[in-house]
């Protein structure tokens, strides 16, 4: 991904996270004035139950949205780390890929002579 795509996705994700968090805060401060009323009829109890159930469902939906947003942030940070790590690996030229077997043989013989001493044939 290009830098601009990552930045755009980061902006969208942070905006989504802030909106979901704001909604959760708003839902957590439900007006309790209707719950504290002195009326003991069943209509009020049913409406309080309905509001509470609806509130729980909304909290669940916004919490799920927060979780998805955090997962998106993890994907973005992984992409940034991969880009950073892979950008530090030097690229090899095609000429450097060829193995010089004669040079390897000379180095091996020199190392063997240094380690074991010259071998007489």
Curated annotation (Swiss-Prot):
Origin: domain of life: Eukaryota
Keyword flag Nucleus: yes
GO molecular function: transcription coregulator activity
Keyword terms of this UniProt record: Activator, Nucleus, Transcription, Transcription regulation
Subcellular location: Nucleus
UniProt entry tagged with the keyword Ribonucleoprotein: no
Location (main, coarse): nucleus
Xref: InterPro entries: Med22, Med22_Saccharomyce
Gene Ontology CC entries for this record: core mediator complex; mediator complex
GO biological process: positive regulation of transcription elongation by RNA polymerase II; positive regulation of transcription initiation by RNA polymerase II; RNA polymerase II preinitiation complex assembly
Subunit structure: Component of the Mediator complex.
Family classification: Belongs to the Mediator complex subunit 22 family.
Function according to Swiss-Prot or TrEMBL: Component of the Mediator complex, a coactivator involved in the regulated transcription of nearly all RNA polymerase II-dependent genes. Mediator functions as a bridge to convey information from gene-specific regulatory proteins to the basal RNA polymerase II transcription machinery. Mediator is recruited to promoters by direct interactions with regulatory proteins and serves as a scaffold for the assembly of a functional preinitiation complex with RNA polymerase II and the general transcription factors.
Protein's UniProt name: Mediator of RNA polymerase II transcription subunit 22
Organism: Eremothecium gossypii (strain ATCC 10895 / CBS 109.51 / FGSC 9923 / NRRL Y-1056)
């Amino acid at each position: 991904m290009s830098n601009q795509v990552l930045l755009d996705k980061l902006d969208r994700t942070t905006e989504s996270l802030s909106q979901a968090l704001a909604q959760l805060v708003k839902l957590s401060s439900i007006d309790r004035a209707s719950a504290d009323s002195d009326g003991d009829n069943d209509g009020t109890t049913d409406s309080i139950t309905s509001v509470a159930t609806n509130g729980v469902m909304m909290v669940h939906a916004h919490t799920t949205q927060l979780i998805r947003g955090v997962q998106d942030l993890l994907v973005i940070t992984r992409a940034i780390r991969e880009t950073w790590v892979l950008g530090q690996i030097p690229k090899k030229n095609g000429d450097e890929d060829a193995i010089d077997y004669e040079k390897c043989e000379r180095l091996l013989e020199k190392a063997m002579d240094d380690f074991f001493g010259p071998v007489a044939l």
